[in-house]
C-alpha cells in the first residue's frame, strides 16, 4: 500500500503471479489484498504457472494413495524416455495406457489396502513393472507405493545413474 501511494500507482493494473505452490498462495494473497483491514487493493488478474492446487496429490504420506496413482503416468513417460519399457507404442499411446491403468486398476486397488487378493496384487505388480521399468521385486518390496526419490534412484541403477528431478 505504501509503495503504491508513494509512487502514485493506484490507477495502475496489478497482477499476482503464482508458480507451483503459489497456486495455493496466490488466491489467498488476492483475497487478503482485496479484503484487508486497511485500504483494499484491487487485483486485475491472477496468473498461475504450473500450479500445485491440491497438496493431497503431492505429499507421499502413509495412508495417502493419491500421489501414487497420480505420479505413475509420469514414471511411465520417464521410463519410456530412458528405454526401460518394452513397447512398440508411441509415447502418447503408452502414456495414455498408463493413465488408464493408474485410474481404473492401480488407484482402486490401492484403496483396498491389505484386502486385495494375492493373485490380483501379482497382476498389478506385473503391470506396474511393465509401465515403469522397475523390477517386480522392487515394486513388491515397496508395496506398489513408490515415491519419486526412490523411483529416480532405481530406474537407472543398473547403469550406475539416477534420474534427475526434472527429467
Regions found by a protein language model. Name each.
Residues 8-21:
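Alpha/beta-hydrolase fold nucleophile elbow
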Residues 30, 34-133:
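A catalytic-pocket lid/entrance helix-loop region that shapes and gates access to the active site
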Residues 18-31:
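Glycine-rich nucleophile elbow surrounding the catalytic serine of serine-hydrolase chemistry
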Residues 1-5:
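Alpha/beta-hydrolase active-site loop
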Residues 109-167:
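Alpha/beta-hydrolase fold catalytic core
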Residues 24-25, 57, 71, 153:
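Short alpha-helical interface elements
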Amino acid at each position: 500500500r505504501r509503495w503504491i501511494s508513494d509512487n502514485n500507482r493506484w490507477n495502475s493494473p496489478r497482477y499476482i503471479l503464482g508458480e507451483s505452490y503459489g497456486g495455493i498462495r496466490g488466491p489467498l494473497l488476492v483475497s487478503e489484498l482485496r479484503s484487508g483491514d486497511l485500504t483494499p487493493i484491487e487485483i486485475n488478474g491472477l496468473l498461475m504457472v504450473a500450479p500445485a492446487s491440491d497438496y493431497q496429490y503431492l505429499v507421499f504420506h502413509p495412508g495417502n494413495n493419491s500421489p501414487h496413482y497420480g505420479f505413475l503416468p509420469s514414471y511411465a513417460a520417464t521410463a519410456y524416455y530412458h528405454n526401460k519399457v518394452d513397447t512398440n507404442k508411441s509415447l502418447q499411446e503408452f502414456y495414455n495406457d498408463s493413465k488408464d491403468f493408474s485410474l481404473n486398476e492401480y488407484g482402486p486397488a490401492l484403496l483396498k489396502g491389505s484386502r486385495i487378493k494375492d493373485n490380483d496384487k501379482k497382476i498389478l505388480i506385473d503391470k506396474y513393472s511393465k509401465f515403469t521399468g522397475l523390477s517386480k521385486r522392487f515394486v513388491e518390496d515397496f508395496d506398489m507405493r513408490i515415491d519419486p526419490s526412490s523411483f529416480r534412484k532405481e530406474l537407472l541403477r543398473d547403469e550406475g545413474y539416477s534420474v534427475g528431478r526434472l527429467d
